[in-house]
Amino acid sequence: MNKSDALVVFSGGQDSTTCLFWAKKHFRKVYALSFIYGQKHVKEVELARVIAGKAGVEFKAMDVSFIGNLGKNSLTDTTITMDEVKPADSFPNTFVPGRNLFFLSIAAVYARELGINHIVTGVSQTDFSGYPDCRDAFIKSLNVTLNLAMDEQFVLHTPLMWIDKAETWALADELGVLDLIRHETLTCYNGVQGDGCGHCPACKLRREGLEKYLEIKAEREKR
């Protein structure tokens, strides 16, 4: 395994783009892997391809559309209206069951073919929106499972695991890509690039984080 290269699970959204540039800072060569999983807004994959090109990163998209057929959710089913608020007794219907499990398992197989043991993902327990497959315990458990399954020494990196959205924007600024991430990524559940629709849960979380970070930055610059 090549310990100086890394594979980034890359959607073209705020978090994974931040992780892409974080990986470029920490590893010699970086590869980006995107997934077509039946999402309504598949244009995110094309935007991911463009961003990867600007970053000088080798890009690959894999079709795993079966994931979208396994369970009902509002990201893949056009007949389901998206939850704007997380239900008190269940996951929000933007949760795609098994998505990160499949993504990271497939990424590990692909990384093995590339001779890579470092895999980077943008999951965060701080801003995990109630998704169980964004938790640190899940990542650590899967890391062990993948190593046992393939007799390898994979390392799953989660640079955003313990930081909130404001701190994620701060990291993007530190990496010199705040403007790129603000204007060129697609985080919006309604498929609107950049600042997004402003109404869906992803846009609200992203906007609140940006506003908080810009306030902190402005206060710091006054000192």
From Swiss-Prot:
<feature type="binding site">
    <location>
        <position position="197"/>
    </location>
    <ligand>
        <name>Zn(2+)</name>
    </ligand>
</feature>
<comment type="similarity">
    <text>Belongs to the QueC family.</text>
</comment>
<dbReference type="GO" id="GO:0008270">
    <property type="term" value="F:zinc ion binding"/>
</dbReference>
<dbReference type="GO" id="GO:0016879">
    <property type="term" value="F:ligase activity, forming carbon-nitrogen bonds"/>
</dbReference>
<feature type="binding site">
    <location>
        <position position="200"/>
    </location>
    <ligand>
        <name>Zn(2+)</name>
    </ligand>
</feature>
<feature type="binding site">
    <location>
        <position position="203"/>
    </location>
    <ligand>
        <name>Zn(2+)</name>
    </ligand>
</feature>
<dbReference type="InterPro" id="IPR014729">
    <property type="entry name" value="Rossmann-like_a/b/a_fold"/>
</dbReference>
<comment type="pathway">
    <text>Purine metabolism; 7-cyano-7-deazaguanine biosynthesis.</text>
</comment>
<comment type="function">
    <text>Catalyzes the ATP-dependent conversion of 7-carboxy-7-deazaguanine (CDG) to 7-cyano-7-deazaguanine (preQ(0)).</text>
</comment>
<keyword id="KW-0671">Queuosine biosynthesis</keyword>
<dbReference type="InterPro" id="IPR018317">
    <property type="entry name" value="QueC"/>
</dbReference>
<protein>
    <recommendedName>
        <fullName>7-cyano-7-deazaguanine synthase</fullName>
        <ecNumber>6.3.4.20</ecNumber>
    </recommendedName>
</protein>
<keyword id="KW-0436">Ligase</keyword>
<keyword id="KW-0862">Zinc</keyword>
<dbReference type="Pfam" id="PF06508">
    <property type="entry name" value="QueC"/>
</dbReference>
<dbReference type="GO" id="GO:0005524">
    <property type="term" value="F:ATP binding"/>
</dbReference>
<feature type="binding site">
    <location>
        <begin position="10"/>
        <end position="20"/>
    </location>
    <ligand>
        <name>ATP</name>
    </ligand>
</feature>
<keyword id="KW-0547">Nucleotide-binding</keyword>
<keyword id="KW-0067">ATP-binding</keyword>
<keyword id="KW-0479">Metal-binding</keyword>
<dbReference type="GO" id="GO:0008616">
    <property type="term" value="P:queuosine biosynthetic process"/>
</dbReference>
<feature type="binding site">
    <location>
        <position position="188"/>
    </location>
    <ligand>
        <name>Zn(2+)</name>
    </ligand>
</feature>
